[in-house]
Amino acid sequence: MQLETQDALYVALELAIAALSVAGNVLVCAAVGTSSALQTPTNYFLVSLAAADVAVGLFAIPFAITISLGFCTDFHSCLFLACFVLVLTQSSIFSLLAVAVDRYLAILVPLRYKSLVTGTRARGVIAVLWVLAFGIGLTPFLGWNSKDSATANCTEPRDGTTNESCCLVKCLFENVVPMSYMVYFNFFGCVLPPLLIMLAIYIKIFLVACRQLQRTELMDHSRTTLQREIHAAKSLAMIVGIFALCWLPVHAINCVTLFQPAQAKDKPKWAMNTAILLSHANSVVNPIVYAYRNRDFRETFHKIISRYVLCQTDVKSGNGQSGAQPVLSMGL
């Protein structure tokens, strides 16, 4: 009974996270789509991040709930359910990395930034990073999976034959995706290096920006612009930090499972469920950060919610002017 209650609580929390993730990130996409002030290359990368978070709510979380229940299905169907969230995670990491590089260029070469980073180039980068994310996330389909061990203990074949490709396996993540892939390839190879690169980039951004601010010959306009860039970098660094805090626990558990299998056998189910919930909750956080840190996003969110959710026809922006467009800013 305790397990059933725990599973019910897990499913309820996952569904709540899914609903909030979809609502918040659809709002982000709508804000960028409707506000010319928000249509910048930086925000295109944030839309890519939001799209991944919408997919987490619509697909990855339902898949995770399905896997947590351990139903029986054929091996490759289960493998797809398990790998889909890896695609979205990798896309999020690449989008965050692209934003970090974008902000680095804005600080390092401000005079050439607009010619280097255009909307067309940003959309091209987004297309490439999604292709890479699918390639990395679906790598287990190339053979790095647990098919041999999973099918060795499968239930009776679906068609009544002894063909192992038709047999049913208990669909649990660890039954189909080996921890060696999750730790060595996914975490050490595809998650940790980009996070460390982003850490180095943001440290460099703040060092360069602080040196420039200390220059007494800076014009007031240049100083104001630089301060806006620093504010944007702080907001984006906050998003990266929250991403790391939300995802590192589940990767830490994976490392323990691989390197200390004896101890991992006794790991409580609630610990893994909590780590998974925390990783999924990351998809809810970003719209809150945007609203808190950026006036353009905050005002556009207010206008969209007032007009399309509350059905108010006379929508006033944060400056009290009816229908006023958000003031253009340098970013978050």
UniProtKB/Swiss-Prot annotation:
The record ties this protein, via CDD domains, to: 7tmA_Adenosine_R_A2B
User: Any idea where this protein resides?
Assistant: Cell membrane
> Pfam families annotated for this entry?
7tm_1 (PF00001)
The Gene Ontology biological process terms listed for this entry are: adenylate cyclase-activating G protein-coupled receptor signaling pathway; regulation of cell communication; regulation of signaling; vasodilation
Binding-site residues for adenosine, renumbered to this chain: 174, 254, 279-280
Ranges of the Extracellular topological domain: 1-8, 68-78, 145-178, 260-267
Its membrane topology is listed as: Multi-pass membrane protein
Q: Which InterPro entries match?
A: Adeno_A2B_rcpt (IPR001435), Adenosn_rcpt (IPR001634), GPCR_Rhodpsn (IPR000276), GPCR_Rhodpsn_7TM (IPR017452)
Q: Which family does it belong to?
A: Belongs to the G-protein coupled receptor 1 family.
In UniProt terms, what function does this protein have?
Receptor for adenosine. The activity of this receptor is mediated by G proteins which activate adenylyl cyclase.
Tell me the protein's name: Adenosine receptor A2b
Gene name of the record? ADORA2B
